[in-house]
Amino acid sequence: MRKEITREWDFELYFKPDCPFCLKVLNYFRENNIIKYPSYNIEDDTSGYENQDKLFEAGGKVQVPCMVIDGKAMYESDDIIAYAKENFLEKAKENKAKREESK
């Protein structure tokens, strides 16, 4: 079952916890304050493979890591990180500042 979170980002990340490429992306996001986004562990899918099915619908394969943004699937950890560097870092800094102000 998908849990609702307060979103700061308009993407979803599909991963497996034992996948080194997934961990590379997850660690990069955490280290750069890219947090509060929907992420789905496709191995811990108590909803009857719903996450795997949605991943397949997005990109035509069940491969992780996969970031789905604007309805398009992006695979490969290096590509995801490069996209994040280009598109997310400034917003991540702004979001972090907002969170710190609200404390």
Spans of features found by a protein language model:
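Local sequence-structure signature of Cys/Sec-based thiol-disulfide redox active-site neighborhoods
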Residues: 1-39
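Short alpha-helical
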Residues: 20-21, 50, 75
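Short glycine/proline-centered loop/turn elements that form peptide/ligand docking sites
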Residues: 40-45
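Structural motif
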Residues: 46-53
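Thiol/disulfide oxidoreductase modules built on the thioredoxin-like
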Residues: 56-63
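A short, hydrophobic beta-strand/beta-hairpin element that forms part of a small beta-sheet core
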Residues: 63-73
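Short, compact, well-ordered microdomains
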Residues: 76-90
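Short acidic DE-rich linear segments
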Residues: 96-103
